[in-house]
Amino acid sequence: MEGLGRSCLWLRRELSPPRPRLLLLDCRSRELYESARIGGALSVALPALLLRRLRRGSLSVRALLPGPPLQPPPPAPVLLYDQGGGRRRRGEAEAEAEEWEAESVLGTLLQKLREEGYLAYYLQGGFSRFQAECPHLCETSLAGRAGSSMAPVPGPVPVVGLGSLCLGSDCSDAESEADRDSMSCGLDSEGATPPPVGLRASFPVQILPNLYLGSARDSANLESLAKLGIRYILNVTPNLPNFFEKNGDFHYKQIPISDHWSQNLSRFFPEAIEFIDEALSQNCGVLVHCLAGVSRSVTVTVAYLMQKLHLSLNDAYDLVKRKKSNISPNFNFMGQLLDFERSLRLEERHSQEQGSGGQASAASNPPSFFTTPTSDGAFELAPT
């Protein structure tokens, strides 16, 4: 990191007009970012799954930044900061004394940005020092903090990482899921090596007893459906037919969502979860499928596991990954699962507070960041 640090004075000058536009990335936790931040900074929202991809080189850091993912690095610098500016090494000058753990978000991003040609630096002393020296250049989402000179900022805070990731500008189902099925092997969970294409199972994959994950081909295979006792079929596409809808032996539900970064799949989570529950309560098999069985159907299945088994996003994703190694939800769907995870935690906290006779905090409903389009708002949770 030697020579890559920039002082608070340098940043103050860069933020003063008419300086070139500076991209500020806040590498702290979402909670700290929402509480207070440097004016104009974007929060880096990287779950462990995407951070692992970034470290392994499976994901380009360019895809995380605003703008088209294939655009060249901008001439303006990128400045990253954390809370304290790194760790001090004894006996060294402050300007050369800051370092980060190899696994940290800031250290990983700084290294990858430099490797990809960005003018990337870190802020010496981090947010704590800058806030102390330049409080007028900081802002907060909390309205009217007594004694604070930081400006409150209404509305959702901007986030970098998942919302800006896009698989294509106007991709069809065949150009997204099907292509990603063949290109995404080995990009997700550590230690998972997908089998050769010719050796992949031809039947749907069992995730839980009676819960199956599959593709369009699986949904059209009457023999395998009968063999597995599947009577309920959740079709997560806008245009694939329900092949046996006229057959009274099957119950269908269709979620008309394309595999595209602009789609809000999370608003269908409650009814999808209810449909799966109905099938399992009847001791019937249920198939959740999309086109290739790697993105939309995986997202719905992971959401179901998170709510019904009280799993974290990482644990639910890894459970599905162990069963089906080639899964690859598009990045905005991953962001919606992150929001869903936060909502589940808030719901559980609210239930605990009610059970203990307390009252839920009035600030317990922060905005969701990835439920696009934004007019759809946040989703309500189905009862567990």
Swiss-Prot record:
InterPro entries: Dual-sp_phosphatase_cat-dom, MKP, Prot-tyrosine_phosphatase-like, Rhodanese-like_dom, Rhodanese-like_dom_sf, Tyr_Pase_dom, TYR_PHOSPHATASE_DUAL_dom
Record has Transferase as a keyword: no
Gene3D superfamilies (UniProt xref): Protein tyrosine phosphatase superfamily, Rhodanese-like domain
Region (Disordered): 348-384
Domain Tyrosine-protein phosphatase: 203-346
Catalyzed chemical reaction(s): O-phospho-L-tyrosyl-[protein] + H2O = L-tyrosyl-[protein] + phosphate; O-phospho-L-seryl-[protein] + H2O = L-seryl-[protein] + phosphate; O-phospho-L-threonyl-[protein] + H2O = L-threonyl-[protein] + phosphate
Phosphoserine: modified positions: 16, 262, 351
Domain of life of the source: Eukaryota
Gene Ontology terms, MF aspect: MAP kinase tyrosine phosphatase activity; MAP kinase tyrosine/serine/threonine phosphatase activity; phosphoprotein phosphatase activity; protein serine/threonine phosphatase activity; protein tyrosine/serine/threonine phosphatase activity; protein tyrosine/threonine phosphatase activity
Location(s), subcellular: Cytoplasm
GO biological process: ERK1 and ERK2 cascade; JNK cascade; MAPK cascade; negative regulation of ERK1 and ERK2 cascade; protein dephosphorylation; signal transduction
Enzyme class, broadest EC rank: hydrolase
Active site, per annotation: 290 (phosphocysteine intermediate)
Keywords: Cytoplasm, Hydrolase, Phosphoprotein, Protein phosphatase
Composition bias, Polar residues: 359-375
Occurrences of domain Rhodanese (ranges): 18-139
Family: Belongs to the protein-tyrosine phosphatase family. Non-receptor class dual specificity subfamily.
PANTHER family: DUAL SPECIFICITY PROTEIN PHOSPHATASE, DUAL SPECIFICITY PROTEIN PHOSPHATASE 9
Listed name of the protein: Dual specificity protein phosphatase 9
Organism: Homo sapiens (Human)
